[in-house]
UniProtKB/Swiss-Prot annotation:
Biased composition annotated in UniProt, kind: Basic and acidic residues: 89-100, 109-130
Gene transcribed to yield this protein: SZRD1
Pfam family, one: SUZ
Domain SUZ: 42-107
Name of this protein: SUZ RNA-binding domain-containing
Keywords of this entry: Acetylation, Phosphoprotein
Domain SUZ-C span(s) in chain numbering: 111-152
Superkingdom assignment: Eukaryota
Entry-linked InterPro entries: SUZ, SUZ-C, SZRD1
Compositionally biased intervals (Polar residues): 66-81
Residue(s) carrying Phosphoserine: 37, 39, 51, 105, 107
Biological source species: Pongo abelii
């Protein structure tokens, strides 16, 4: 770089051809470096043509999941254990026990006998004591007209 001449302006360097020589020199250097550090050859990409027959479609197999003990179960068998069938008397006894635990009574008949005290009784007034429903005024329209009484 020390022995290179520096031009007064870029116009003088362009006229003398100095810029062209420097560019060619740098281009040769970069080409040499690229040859030294050659990358492995690029693999060509094959684009399949639609006119050629395609291969068979890939095989899809549906596999069954093994159960917890490693044996594949059949689709008809259920994974739930079968519960023993209870008789009507056993079911009624369990129902009565649960009802007593939750509601405090064993059967619904016990509650029907007791009157319901939670609801307030409605007091009905005799017809005479009711106040008459008198209309105090008839509404007027916004412009002072008769309002609802106005006939169309």
């Amino acid at each position: 770089m020390e022995d290179e001449e520096v031009a007064e302006s870029w116009e003088e360097a362009a006229d003398s051809g100095e810029i062209d020589r420097r560019l060619e020199k740098k281009l040769k250097i970069t080409q040499k470096e690229s040859r030294k550090s050659k990358s492995p050859p690029k693999v060509p990409i094959v684009i399949q043509d639609d006119s050629l027959p395609a291969g068979p479609p890939p095989q899809i197999r549906i596999l069954k999941r093994p159960t917890s003990n490693g044996v594949v179960s059949s689709p008809n068998s259920t994974s739930r254990p079968t519960l023993p069938v209870k008789s009507l008397a056993q079911r009624e006894a369990e129902y009565a026990e649960a009802r007593k635990r939750i509601l405090g009574s064993a059967s619904p008949e016990e509650e029907r006998e007791k009157p319901i005290l939670d609801r307030p009784t409605r007091i009905s007034q005799p017809e005479d004591s009711r106040q008459p429903n008198n209309v105090i005024r008839q509404p007027l329209g916004p412009d002072g007209s008769q309002g609802f009484k106005q006939r169309r």
